[in-house]
Amino acid sequence: MIISSTNDYREAARRRVPPFMFHYADGGSFSERTLERNVTDLADLALRQRVLKDMSQLDTEIELFGEKLAMPAVLAPVGACGMYARRGEVQAAQAAENKGIPFTLSTVSICPIEEVTAAIKRPMWFQLYVLKDRGFMKHVLERAKAAGCSTLVFTVDMPTPGARYRDRHSGMSGDYKEIRRALQAVTHPFWAWDVGIKGKPHTLGNVSAYTGKAVGLDDYVVWLGENFDPSISWKDLEWIRDFWDGPMVIKGILDPEDAKDAVRFGADGIVVSNHGGRQLDGALSSARALPSIADAVKGDIKILADSGIRNGLDIVRMLALGADATMLGRAFVYALGAAGKAGVENMLDIFKKEMHVAMTLTSNQKISDITRDALVDLSKL
């Protein structure tokens, strides 16, 4: 099929990846209203077209936490990413490196930290959940540190699992899930060969290394459910701040007061995020939450944003709302599931070209030029 957008990659991934994995990435929580609004609230923002400005020296590069990025985007942490392509985390990390941006490895990745870092030269980022098992947290932080991970992304919006009803329908969870997955694999032969057979082991590499036994997909949901910690507070993060030498980013901020708390805590960055609509359905979209957060803490802390970004225009919109950079999740997973490393590289090329178009036609030559002036206030029309 012809590929020219994230939507095309989504459709290609839907055809190639079995439903239990496709819908795990594609779905949200409850009725998926926040998932929907993440996309529509961002896409509905009108860009302010300006013309007859010299855009011949247009530049999408930025510096973030001492790293140079070819564009203001980071590949976000996605659990079980290695189930979308053979050793998928490695392929995605290599694609990000080739295109000049960081890759973030999830705590619950298929490929362990050491396998991914051995495959790339650029230091990757590492994401950590708040878990009851502090021994695991310390263990995995030590490994990330030893492997040269540059930035820690600490996810704080999962003190409890979200109610992801679609997973029960798709076979990711629910009755007879093993049989349903096996039948789905039979009807998706390319995936069954490339990932199902040649992509083994299908265990959570970082968790298995700690427990000393294989922790697979069936154990994944149970292990996470048992280890989410609803008692977590800012005080519990202090030992992590003391232990981690590099930049620390708090992911899952939707309220200005929480953003101010992150500044007081000493975090280097925040990610304005609702977990892609996978946690609290009914929460604000990131596009709606971002402006007030930027008003509260812009300049005091680096602001990243995710959830709902489907093209390069959306990146420009997030920057105009106050973000310093963005994180891309579903978009790269669709591309990875559809075409592996080459798909992710092509998707990033598409996003960069779309950014060039948006920046040229809004007359913003550098990323630092993009402000809310790049948007049209439709309420005044």
UniProtKB/Swiss-Prot annotation:
Reactions catalysed: (S)-lactate + A = pyruvate + AH2
InterPro entries: Aldolase_TIM, Alpha-hydoxy_acid_DH_FMN, FMN-dep_DH, FMN_HAD, FMN_hydac_DH_AS, LldD
UniProt binding sites for FMN: 106, 127, 155, 251, 306-330
Superkingdom, taxonomy of origin: Bacteria
Compartment(s) of residence: Cell inner membrane
Positions that bind substrate: 24, 129, 164, 278
Any GO BP: lactate metabolic process
Assigned EC number: 1.1.-.-
Pfam families: FMN_dh (PF01070)
Protein keywords: Cell inner membrane, Cell membrane, Flavoprotein, FMN, Membrane, Oxidoreductase
Bilayer topology annotation: Peripheral membrane protein
GO cellular component: plasma membrane
Start and end residues of each FMN hydroxy acid dehydrogenase domain: 1-380
Any one GO molecular-function label of the UniProt entry: L-lactate dehydrogenase activity
Catalytic-site annotation from UniProt: 275
Family of this protein: Belongs to the FMN-dependent alpha-hydroxy acid dehydrogenase family.
Job of this protein: Catalyzes the conversion of L-lactate to pyruvate. Is coupled to the respiratory chain.
Protein name as annotated: L-lactate dehydrogenase
Higher taxonomy: Bacteria, Pseudomonadati, Pseudomonadota, Gammaproteobacteria, Pasteurellales
